[in-house]
Amino acid sequence: MALSQGLLTFRDVAIEFSQEEWKCLDPAQRTLYRDVMLENYRNLVSLDISSKCMMKEFLSTAQGNREVFHTGTLERHESHHIGDFCFQETDKDIHNLEFQWQEDERNGHEVLMTEIKKLTGSTDQYNQSHARNKPIKDQLGSSFYSHLPELHIFQTQGKIDNQVEKSINNASSISTAQRISCRPKTHISNNYGNNFLNSLLLTQKQEVRMREKSFQYNESGKAFNYSSLLRKHQIIHLGEKQYKCDVCGKVFNRKRNLACHRRCHTGEKPYRCNECGKTFSQTYSLTCHRRLHTGEKPYKCEECDKAFSFKSNLKRHRRIHAGEKPYKCNECGKTFSQTSSLTCHRRLHTGEKPYKCNECGKTFSWKSSLTCHHRLHTGEKPYKCNECGKTFSQELTLKCHRRLHTGEKPYKCNECGKVFNKKANLARHHRLHSGEKPYKCTECVKTFSRNSALVIHKAIHIGEKRYKCNECGKTFSRISALVIHTAVHTGEKPYKCNECGKGFYRKAHLVCHHRLHTGEKPYKCNECGKVFNRKTHLAHHHRLHTGDKPYKCNECGKVFNQKAHLARHHRLHTGEKPYKCTECGKVFNQKANLARHHRLHTGEKPYKFSECGTVLN
């Protein structure tokens, strides 16, 4: 491939596309085109060749493609001195159009080329003020064109319809306007436009990158093409913050950071999500928000391969692997991996409950607790079990429920090895070993290991019996007692002994009965060493040592150590005889008396005298 090299002006390297040709380029090619053309223009601006005529060249080129080219960064105005002349950059004017271009590009709109014409008048004003009303070309004379940047293009033979091969060795005798008027427009057909663009622009891009970086920072050793970039880099190292907010006084090291910060005060949110319409004050926030719609999770944990939508979430997650807990509570010294967790924890010390239910006025320390509570009013149960279809208002409740299907019991007692499917059940069980009874009755100072037991106990003091039997009208303070009582009417005894087939109303009764077959007596008296198969029997026996008789007769004042003894004694005052013989109809006030009487009918004599062999009933 034959290459021809020539020293050209900005207009000579400008490429024009028709509207149809421009649409054929992908975004990456458009960006590359924009960056290189702007770089070429800036090289001319640095020598103040951005006269009105040259600016119109740039504008007409841009207008043909209906795109505005932006650097993406805002650079501070600087001055370059060549002899006695000062040349000011026009980056600020270019940046003023940057935001509008980004907005139109994001929304898919065509850029209005009338906006960029604002740049046209700026160069004329500068020429008048800095060159004593004389154009810079006249000031420099014949040396003017020696300052032109060497912009080389390599033309691919046979791929350009109307190539213009011009040398500007005699540029001093030809005016800029003449060069513009005599230069034919170069159009690129759709067949080879993309290939030519890549070849031309990439070559120029490489020249820019290969250019010597003459501005170096001694601290970091980093070099830059422009002194403005070096100045920005120095600000980062020095911690210099020269842009101050007029409202709150906060300072920033970049002007664009200050502009973003000001939106916090004004409430301006110029960036809008096309999916849901939500608006944001920063373009970065919009970018992160869009990932919620796309499901994109670009941040991946190297330890467990878990992915996240936000970099901050990945940073917090990494603390789990590292065990890092940088946030410490000043009250109790407890540490946390997240600052939000520390904030919530502090409310335990302050008692603050900032979240209030609008329905009932109840307050909560955590927002999640309020959300769960609110479902009690709405009846919402969004969490569903895939096994049985049961729904729950809390995700934790569903998680515990699933263990019923899987049989998982992850919580183990360190004392006896017993396992549980709920952490709360393990905590209650642990109190059996420690003897802890944190729930105290305010009426009688009695303590309990479970809150539910305390609630049941309180019903004794207030005499409340909310649960009523529909058969006989008898009331109970516990629903479990009502269920057991109902079995008396139905005759149902669902708990059956596998040894003898005897049935029981309650499971606890079956457990106690089973010890008669096994001979197990797990309850031992610490005073005399006597053992019992029931806990209630041990409690009754213990009163023999203490002399405690808590049950008192209201009629005669006699006291008893067992409730059953008081009930039996009370029948002497009332004359009640609830036990009736089915054979002869005789009634008795004690069950033991009925049992002895019943042997008269059966002839049973279970008691035998060992000395003489006499049997008695």
Curated annotation (Swiss-Prot):
UniProt keyword annotation of Transcription regulation present: yes
Keywords, comma-separated and alphabetical: DNA-binding, Metal-binding, Nucleus, Repeat, Transcription, Transcription regulation, Zinc, Zinc-finger
Family statement: Belongs to the krueppel C2H2-type zinc-finger protein family.
GO cellular component: nucleus
ZnF start-end (C2H2-type): 215-237, 243-265, 271-293, 299-321, 327-349, 355-377, 383-405, 411-433, 439-461, 467-489, 495-517, 523-545, 551-573, 579-601
Protein name, entry field: Zinc finger protein 813
Role this protein plays: May be involved in transcriptional regulation.
Subcellular location: Nucleus
Pfam family name, one: KRAB
Source organism of the structure: Pongo abelii (Sumatran orangutan)
Gene Ontology MF terms in the entry: DNA-binding transcription factor activity, RNA polymerase II-specific; RNA polymerase II cis-regulatory region sequence-specific DNA binding; zinc ion binding
Record domain KRAB: where: 8-81
Keyword Repeat recorded: yes
